[in-house]
Amino acid sequence: PESVVNVPILAMSSIEAQANLGYSMNFKEFTLCQTMYITANVCVVSPVIYINVLDPKKHKKDLEAQTVKVDEYQATVGMEGILKKGLVVTAGETELKENEDYTLAFDTDGYLVVTLITSGKGASASELTVSGKMLDTSAVDKYDIIGAYDVNSGKETGMEVIRQIFPKLGMVPGILLAPGWSHEPEVGIALCAKAANINGVFRAVAFLDLDTEKAKKYTDVKEVKEKSGFTSELCYVLWPCFMVGELIFSASAVAAARLAYLDAENEDIPSKSPSNKQTPITGTCLADGTEIVLDQDQGTVVNSFGVATAINRNGFRPWGSYTGAWPASGDAKDVWLNVRRMFIWQGNTFIQTYFDKVDDNMNRALIDNIIDSENIRCAAYAPQHWAGASIEYLASDNPATSILAGEMKFRQHIAPYTPAQTINNVLNYDIDTLTSALTEG
């Protein structure tokens, strides 16, 4: 429906998302449905906020006349994306009227079902002819996903709608993704830019896919990643696609759901890496279905490029904790996904926790209140989620000019754990124990 185009749609379940936006198993054309399926059948998580850019006013084409058989007053048009608005239904030469002669609905496959009303003109018809308009997913392009701001209407589209999430829904986005589109450099880079600045104060991470038409083997990954421009500390880059049986998904859709599930198990604190956590997928492949079989050694090579993948070790699992900033950066707070997310989470949490203090009198009581409250709050997360954290108010950070301007600055120190990416075990031959055992007695 037009009412759910370019607006943030909050869904507390996959069923709720499907009810608002519709659903199709054609994940290549209806890309949001990937997340609907995964969050219902692979990693059950909620809430999810969807932004649909498929606009029936703009992305449509003619529906050529379809003749369908009537069975027990019902006729099903076996095509997805048919628009109810402007639909013409005829029985022979007689044009029928909706809600007088028939009703319309969609079945679970997304096909249009025409149900004849027994008192209507077409009640005795054995077949119907249907024509009108239908959605044209091929008309959607990367610039629809990126979106824009219309200076005349004041309307936002695409990624620009991310701005509306907090003021409308009161939620701060944590992971941004565009499955089926983020492999496009323009889309991926724009998504990272949005993650860096949400409502002027918040930050998030972006999960991006590499183009499997360009990166067909694991040794192609480095060049494709760099040419795509996916080098931000705010992005988590994945290659190739993930499979569940015969279904093919963008890796970003699966990994984002798996990480959200991990967060939920971890008190909603993003202190853990998704790497090496078993995930119910059955394989990896290119977008065209070509199977990719990586062992640990090859997966680690992919990781060395700052790209995550999946390997099979008694079950498939994501493999890789680096953000896109690796290997160009060696800064621990930027190259480890869980460390970067902890910095983002702490920054966002501080803003939300102390927002009510804004415009209070800037006095010592306010300073002490924030310092004491924050130190107590942060201490509760040690040692499980980080090694520790502290906050201070320094005179050097708060000169008279800042105080007179109504500005105050705190300096916080946090110590999230880095992942144990490599665990080495050095074996030594204990000759003393050997000789002792042989000479005893």
Predicted regions and their residues:
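Small/polar beta-strand repeat architecture
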Residues: 120-136
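A surface-exposed beta-strand-loop module
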Residues: 103-125
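Acidic, low-complexity glycine/serine/threonine-rich segments
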Residues: 336-396
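N-terminal alpha-helical "arm" segments
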Residues: 1-9, 15, 439-441
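Extended beta-strand solenoid/passenger and fiber regions
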Residues: 43-107, 134-137
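Exposed beta-strand and adjacent loop surfaces of beta-rich binding modules
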Residues: 6, 84-88, 125-127
